[in-house]
Amino acid sequence: VDTCADDGSPGSLRAQVTAAASGDLIDLSQLTCSTITLANSAIMVTQPSLTLQGRGPEALTIDGAGHYSAFYHLGAGTLGIADVTIANGYYAGSFEPKGGCIFSKGNVFLFHSVVTHCTVGSLSASEPAIGGGVYAEGNLTMKNSTITESHVLASVNGPNAFGGGGYVIGSVAMLYSTISNNTATQFFGANVGDGGGLFVKGAVDITYSTISGNSADYVGGLEIFSNQPATIFNGTISGNVGKLGYGGLWTKSALTISNSTIAFNAARSDASGTSTAGLHSLAPLVLQSSIIADNIGPNGPSDLGGMAGISITGDNNLITSYTLPPPMNTRSECPHLQPLADNGGSTRTHELSHTSVAIDHGSNPLTLQKDQRFATRDVGAATDIGSVEWQPGETDERLFVAGFDGLCDQ
C-alpha cells in the first residue's frame, strides 16, 4: 500500500485487499501518512485469511469516518490486524447490525492494535445490535491490544443489544490486553444492553489483561454465556457498572480465577435483589489467591454470589462479602487497594497499599514468575493475593487522590 487515499487506485488499501490471495500480508508499514479514511463503504475481505501490517497504532489509523464499519470479513479463516488503530466505525441498520469496526465470519487476531470509537445500532424488530467494536463468529485473539470506547444500542422495538466492546461466538484469548470504557445500553429507553465490555459464547482465557470502566444495563464488564471452560490469571476486572444488575463478571461457564483482582465494580439497581456487583456465577468456581472486594450493589457490599449449591473451591483468597460459601482460608479484611493506574506493564492495575493484609498471604498455584504488570512475583515471605505483587519502596500516595475512597476503607 502506497497511498492513504481510499480511491480504488492500485496502491490503495481497498485495491490491495481486493487483489490479495488468502494468506497474504498487506503491508502498510511504509506509509508516511497517518490516516486512511474510508470514502464509500467497509472494506470487503472475501479471502479466508488475510493480515494487515501497519507501523504502530499511534502512527496509522484506518477510519470509518462515522459512516461505515471498517472491515467486513466473509472468510472462515483469520483476519489479522497488526500495529494499526481501527476507529470510528458505525453501522445502524436492520440487516446484520453487527461489528461496528470489524465484522468477521471467521476469526479475528489483534496484535499491538487498537479498536476504538465504534458503534452498532439496530433498526430491526428482530435483529439485535451485536459487537460494538468487534463481531466474530469464530475466535477473538488479542495480544498487546485494546478495544475501547465502543457501543451497542438496543432497538426501540426489537431485541436487546449485546457486547459493547465485542461479541464472540467462538473462544476469546486475551494476553497483555485491555477492554475498557465500552457500553451496551438502551436506545430511547426501550430494551436493554448486555455485556458492556465483552459477550462471549465460547471458551475464555484471560491473562495479564484488564477489563475496566465498561457499562451495560446488565453485566457491565464480561459476560460468559457458555458451557465451555474459562480461566483468568494475573487479570483485573475493575470499575464496570451494571445499571440494572451484575457489575464486573457474570458466567454460566465453569471458571478458574488465579492471582487476579475483581474490585470497584457496581450493580446500581436490581429489583430482584439476586445479582452481584463483583463475580456472579451459575457454574462451579475455582478461586486461587485472588481479591474480590470493594464491589458495591444497591444494598451495600456485593462481591461474590450466584446460584445456590454450586461448587466453589480453592484457597488463599480475600473476599470481603459473599452470598455463597467461599473457599477455605478466605480472608475478609479490607485489601486497601490503590486506584486503577498505570503501574508498569501493558495494562492498568490496582497496587496494594503497604498495610494490605493481601501481602504475603497468597499462593502461586501456577508458579508464575511475574505479576500482571510484569514485576517479580513472590517478593517477601510468600505470594501476595491478587494480580499485583507489592514491591519494597512502593508508596501509598494514590490512596489520597481526589474522589478515591474504597468501599471497605470508609
Predicted regions and their residues:
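Ser/Thr-rich, Pro/Gly/Ala-heavy low-complexity intrinsically disordered linkers and tails
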Residues: 195, 221, 396-406
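Short, solvent-exposed mixed-charge patches
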Residues: 408-410
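Generic short beta-strand segments
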Residues: 31-32, 87-88, 117-119, 151, ...
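N-terminal, post-signal-peptide segments of secreted/periplasmic proteins
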Residues: 1-106, 269-274, 281-396
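Glycine-centric low-complexity/flexibility signal
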Residues: 91-99, 119-135, 152-163, 183, ...
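Predominantly extracellular beta-rich ligand-binding scaffolds that present long acidic/polar faces
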Residues: 104-115, 126, 136-149, 168-194, ...
